Amino acid sequence: MNLFRFCSGLKVLGYFMILLVVAVVGVSYYAVVVSTWWPILIRGDHGALSALAALIIFVFHFLLIMLLWSYFTTVFTDPGSVPEHFRREMGGGDSLEAGTSTDQGAFGSLGYCTKCRNVKPPRCHHCSVCQRCVLKMDHHCVWIVNCVGARNYKFFLLFLFYTFLETMLDVIVLLPSFIEFFSQAIKHSSSPGKLASLVLAFVLNFAFVLSLLCFVVMHISLLSSNTTSVEVHEKNGEVRWKYDLGKKKNFEQVFGKKKAFWLLPLYSKDDIDNITSLEGLEFPTCSDIDP
């Protein structure tokens, strides 16, 4: 029985996950901005509190814009597949047999995909959901209906980063309402439905904060060692992973060298032209830079 044929169903699930992301954003927006801080701001009868409301609303919208920008860039960016010119240059895999590899100079050790029946560059893996080989594949993410690979890994990390900050902000500003829900004040509340929506938003954001914290820590560790989620199982206890070039170079392979672009879900033209790893075909190893 081929279980991989059911993987295509994950794509259908992914479209519902996009709607779920939009729904959570909508609930959070209503709870934080519409119900809580916007009324305080427009009343303007509390100097310090109004200033705090303005600050919270500004930060909330800034993080929301960066979150959605990073998210949809990740969704709509091709993670990278083996280009046709690469297959032609490498002979289409005719010289390779299934399960073998060979050294091809600048491209390092090439592999062979038994499903695509073609040659593949280093760090490239076959995705059973997308039905193709993905360059520097990290994993297939149902939340974005896409693979995370060489060309959208930075955008995915920024999506995690901004989502974590946004949900953390929501948890902090909604905490008083959550506490109020369990106090005697709920019995005297003129709008229990509004209070319930605030509590729902708090619970959802708190759950996301906990899960995202684990995910962010994991990917910081992977980024610092220049490792993907797939490659964690390939390292086989190596003292030093062959693609680990040091934390600075590892970071630049994903985020580029232009600091002004590090927190934006896009690359500078110089980085695209000069960093081969962003194309997902060539990756220097530690033996290339060690004296």
Curated annotation (Swiss-Prot):
> Where are the active-site residues found?
141 (s-palmitoyl cysteine intermediate)
Q: Quote a single Gene Ontology cellular component term.
A: plasma membrane
Q: So where does this one cross the membrane?
A: 14-34, 49-69, 155-175, 198-218
Question: What region holds the DHHC domain?
Answer: 111-161
The answer to whether UniProt assigns keyword NADP to this entry is: no
**Cellular location(s):** Cell membrane
The reactions it catalyses are: L-cysteinyl-[protein] + hexadecanoyl-CoA = S-hexadecanoyl-L-cysteinyl-[protein] + CoA
The main location is: membrane
Protein's membrane topology: Multi-pass membrane protein
Which GO terms label this protein's molecular function in UniProt? protein-cysteine S-palmitoyltransferase activity
E.C. number: 2.3.1.225
> What domain of life is recorded for the organism?
Eukaryota
Instruction: Provide this UniProt record's keywords sorted from A to Z.
Output: Acyltransferase, Cell membrane, Lipoprotein, Membrane, Palmitate, Transferase, Transmembrane, Transmembrane helix
Report the InterPro entries cross-referenced here.
Palmitoyltrfase_DHHC, PFA4/ZDH16/20/ERF2-like
Q: Does the keyword 4Fe-4S apply?
A: no
* Sequence similarity: Belongs to the DHHC palmitoyltransferase family.
Which comment does the entry carry about domains?
The DHHC domain is required for palmitoyltransferase activity.
Q: What does this protein do?
A: Palmitoyl acyltransferase.
The entry's protein name is: Probable protein S-acyltransferase 12
- This protein's species is Arabidopsis thaliana (Mouse-ear cress)
Q: Which gene encodes it?
A: PAT12
